Amino acid sequence: MSAFTGVIVEGKRCLDAGASTGGFTDVLLRRNAGHVVAVDVGYGQLAWGLRQDERVTVLDRTNIRHLTGDMVGEAIDLVVADLSFISLTLVLPALAAVSKPEADFVLMVKPQFEVGREKLGAGGVVRDPALRKAAVIEVAESAYDVGLGTLGIAASSLPGPAGNVEYFLWLRRGAPEIDHAMLDEAIAIGPQ
């Protein structure tokens, strides 16, 4: 998230989609988020200290695709997502529906869950930069279809567990469509 200096966390009501053990939830709280709704399809994974924090609402056993405003309560200012085994394209409508019109979205694009099994290399790694680029474009275009344009793209400095190169997208309503030159630059300076 530090790649996107325009994303303000302090005092914001945040949603951590795919919270798991709470990596993003912890980052948000350390940056003084007002509240974090931690959502995961699993159960009991969120670190105990985060689970006990009064600034955190835990929604375990919750499929992001079925998330509603009633479930999260007050609308969300900042959405972060780090999802596995599901394409972001499938959850964008639900994430957009529970957020405020001026909300920011910082999504981790994991090409291994976007390109389809038939395009994965050995060990589930997407090695072809063209496939990684196509994955980011597909997510950004799906976001644009629900009204979210792209303000920033950054390669994650840490590869995924199997060695996959992953990317962050910064999205907001009213922002332009994806800038392919910005994407090419993120791919060029990111891990290969």
Regions found by a protein language model. Name each.
Residues 35-90:
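S-adenosyl-L-methionine
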Residues 27-35:
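Conserved S-adenosyl-L-methionine
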Residues 3-10, 72-73:
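Glycine-rich helix-loop-beta junction characteristic of Rossmann-like nucleotide cofactor-binding loops
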Residues 89-106:
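A short glycine-rich, Lys/Arg-flanked "PGG" loop and its adjoining helix->strand segment in the class I
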Residues 22-23, 44:
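Glycine-rich SAM-binding Motif I of class I
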Residues 111-128:
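Short, glycine-/aromatic-enriched active-site segment of Class I SAM-dependent methyltransferases
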Residues 9-20:
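Conserved class I S-adenosyl-L-methionine
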Residues 165, 169-192:
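Flexible, glycine-/basic-rich loop-and-beta segments that form/coincide
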